[in-house]
Every structure is written in C-alpha cells, then in structure tokens.
C-alpha cells in the first residue's frame, strides 16, 4: 500500500521549442499580361529570360500554450484520470503534452508557480495515483472522488486520494513528504508512511516511500510531470 500511495506523482514544489507549422504550399501567381510564344522563345534565347512560378514564403502558424492547455484538458476530461482512455487517446495526450512542454519556463523547480493545490486530472498509468484502489479489481469496490496534491513552501508535499467504498463509505488515503530539488527540473520527495481515514477510523500503515519527478511545464493553470519510470502526469490548479 505504501508503494501504491507513493505513486501519486509529485510535480514538485520547485515543478521537453515552439509549435511551428510551416506551409510548404506553392502558389502559382498569374502573369499580368501574356506574351506570344514565338516572341517569348525568341526573347528567352537572346535575353535569358526565365519565366517561372513564384513561391510564397513560408508562413509560421503558432499554437500558443493556452490553446495547447485547452486541447489537453479536453482530451483528458471525464476520463477518470486517464482510466477510460484508449491507447490511441493516450498517444494523443502525450503528443499535446510534448508540444506544451516546449513552452516550459527555465528552471521550473525554482519557480514559485509550483506551489499551491493541484488536482491530478491525468496519468498515463492510471493506477499510479491511488495504486490498488484504482486497479481493475479495486475500481469494482472503490470509486475515486478526487486526487489532490498540495505543495507548500518551502518543501512540503501532501498527496490525498479521496475514495468511496461500496457506495456508502467515504475515506481518504494521504501521504506527507519532504521535497528536495535534484537539479533545475527534477525533484525527489520522501514520504512518510501513508495514512488512511475511513469514517472515524484513522491509522498509519506501511513504510516510507520515495518518488522522483521531472517538472516539464508549469504556469498559473497547469503543471506537467514526468515520473522516473516514464509516467506522464497532468495537474490542474485548483481554484
């Protein structure tokens, strides 16, 4: 269970260039007047006149981070954190996230935007946040209500998965950890043993756990994290 809860990835408290679509279409622009073929051929020979089509310069169509964020959130909406998405849909999410991370600020680990309360809206491995509770069997008995990560300055991380058991019993599984910056993008969090609350019952179990996360994007709305085993996490800031 410790490994379970610990998988709730942390886009640390301190947290892959621009989308450019090039137009290679060539436009044939009409001449303003016609030249008789014989005259044209004659002049071409004498003057080396070359008549060719004019190609338009490449035009950059840029998709900004706001558009990418909207697209990303629409792709993961109502997916139970990614559980209901098909393999193809997971690929689409990864592609959009890959474009968005090109806009990441430098040294996201040091950016104060990483602090605050975040909702885990997607994970490429849906069982990572919440562990066994979100496995195929676990979902038969436990419904995930929300997955929250709070990052408090300067170095405290709190993960909480709220669940409903058997349709009538509410509970929480939470982790509290200490955040450490490894470099400008990677952080490490060492968590205390998980704590579970079910009704009036509250207890700790298991052992300490550790996770490492690379912050690949952060702004006022969204944060992206990449786990050490390749799991992609999407965090949306809570209002």
UniProtKB/Swiss-Prot annotation:
Its main location: plastid. The modification N-acetylserine is found at residue 53. Keywords: Acetylation, Chloroplast, Plastid, Transit peptide. InterPro entries: PAP (IPR039633), PAP/fibrillin_dom (IPR006843). Residues 1-52 form a transit peptide. One of its GO terms (cellular component) is thylakoid. It is found in: Plastid, Chloroplast. Transmembrane segments: none annotated. Belongs to the PAP/fibrillin family. This is Probable plastid-lipid-associated protein 8, chloroplastic. The gene is PAP8.
């Amino acid at each position: 269970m410790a490994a379970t809860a610990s998988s709730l990835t942390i886009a640390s408290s301190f947290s892959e260039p621009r989308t450019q679509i090039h137009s290679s279409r060539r436009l044939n622009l009409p001449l303003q007047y016609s030249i008789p073929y014989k005259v044209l051929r004659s002049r071409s020979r004498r003057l080396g006149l070359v008549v060719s089509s004019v190609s338009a310069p490449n035009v950059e169509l840029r998709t900004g981070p706001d558009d990418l964020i909207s697209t990303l959130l629409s792709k993961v909406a109502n997916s139970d954190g990614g559980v209901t998405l098909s393999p193809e849909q997971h690929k689409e999410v990864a592609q959009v996230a890959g474009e968005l991370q090109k806009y990441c600020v430098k040294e996201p680990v040091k950016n104060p935007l990483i602090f605050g309360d975040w909702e885990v809206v997607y994970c490429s491995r849906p069982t990572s946040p919440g562990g066994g509770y979100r496995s195929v069997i676990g979902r038969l008995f436990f419904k995930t209500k929300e997955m929250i990560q709070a990052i408090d300055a300067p170095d405290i991380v709190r993960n909480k998965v709220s669940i409903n058991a058997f349709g009538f019993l509410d509970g929480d599984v939470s982790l509290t950890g200490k955040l450490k910056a490894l470099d400008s993008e990677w952080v490490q969090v060492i968590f205390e043993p998980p704590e579970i609350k079910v009704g009036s019952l509250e207890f700790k179990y298991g052992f300490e756990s550790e996770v490492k996360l690379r912050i690949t994007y952060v702004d006022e709305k969204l944060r992206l994290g990449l786990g050490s085993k390749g799991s992609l996490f999407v965090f949306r800031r809570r209002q």
